[in-house]
Amino acid sequence: MSAVLPDTTPAGQRIAPGEVALLAAVFVVAACGLVYELAAGALASYLLGDSVLQFSTVIGTYLFAMGIGSWLSRLIERQLVAQFLRIELLVALIGGLMPAALFLAHGSLPASSTGAFRVLLYGLVLVVGVLVGLEIPLVMRILKRHFGQRYALKELVSQVLTFDYLGALVVAVAFPLLLVPHLGLLRTGIFFGLLNALVAAWALLIFRAELRAWALQAAATAAVLIVLVGALFGAEHLTTWAEDRF
């Protein structure tokens, strides 16, 4: 006769919803960051030509910016969750709309203004890269602060980087095979911006008890979601207009 074994897992060792939200955020941050990087490189190649040069400079600029963001993260000392939410919303808005902004700028600028377009391109890549670079160190610090009893430092780093690299792997495969063929570059960027914003909304609910000005944070999250959903529906018209001007 079989017996049912009692649950001997200590309550403090069970995975909390906040922990799941943060690890999911790492996966999404990595996936979205790579999408924005690939979309910028692909658009630059399409609009400016010389794909090797465009991808090399975009990827190099993005990684450099992530390094700056990681270094700057040490300056954030208080309200880590609130700061993470703000950064996540900025990444969602700027990164998600970056392909659309680049298409719009290229269609609006004179053909001779490639210099201005490059300034916008690398400026946006720098901003998104810095913001993404800020996120991962913040997530690690939040995990350590809230769930430090579950993790030694080596386990924390291992967990976070595992989800980071898994997110990058999924996007590296899906971007050329599924996302761009079915959604196009503009919708792909906006879709992943929505994912960033949804992670912010989830974290907003999970960490509600420790957030100041929760209603303001919720309103900002809702506004970003509304903008991105509207952009998703308008992406086809923008693509058609920009391609007619190309």
Task: Tell me what each language-model feature is.
Residues 2-246:
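Alpha-helical transmembrane segments of multi-pass membrane proteins
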